[in-house]
């Protein structure tokens, strides 16, 4: 039997990949989204969740960034 899934290959640094693996393991998006963990910098994910992933990554980047006016 053959299973077909539409996916997207994501290339990222190892730190971001760990964040994606964390989101997948904790079911933060409501379901598992990683189809295949390929290597240290590549992950194959379900295509329909790419926009949600981009939002989560954006939130993470906003939390880790600071402006020059902050002390």
UniProtKB/Swiss-Prot annotation:
Q: What does this protein do?
A: Component of the general transcription and DNA repair factor IIH (TFIIH) core complex, which is involved in general and transcription-coupled nucleotide excision repair (NER) of damaged DNA and, when complexed to CAK, in RNA transcription by RNA polymerase II. In NER, TFIIH acts by opening DNA around the lesion to allow the excision of the damaged oligonucleotide and its replacement by a new DNA fragment. In transcription, TFIIH has an essential role in transcription initiation.
Question: What keywords sit in the KW lines?
Answer: Cytoplasm, Disease variant, DNA damage, DNA repair, Ichthyosis, Nucleus, Phosphoprotein, Transcription, Transcription regulation
A Pfam family found in this protein is Tfb5
Which family would the database say this protein is a member of? Answer: Belongs to the TFB5 family.
What quaternary arrangement does the UniProt entry report? Component of the 7-subunit TFIIH core complex composed of XPB/ERCC3, XPD/ERCC2, GTF2H1, GTF2H2, GTF2H3, GTF2H4 and GTF2H5, which is active in NER. The core complex associates with the 3-subunit CDK-activating kinase (CAK) module composed of CCNH/cyclin H, CDK7 and MNAT1 to form the 10-subunit holoenzyme (holo-TFIIH) active in transcription.
Q: Which gene encodes it?
A: GTF2H5
Superkingdom of this protein's organism: Eukaryota
Annotated compartments: Nucleus; Cytoplasm
Using the record's annotations, give every residue carrying the modification Phosphothreonine.
Answer: 69
- Write the protein's name: General transcription factor IIH subunit 5
Write down the species: Homo sapiens
The primary location reported for this protein is nucleus
Q: Which InterPro entries match?
A: TFB5-like_sf, TFIIH_TTDA/Tfb5
A Gene Ontology biological process noted in the UniProt record is: cellular response to gamma radiation
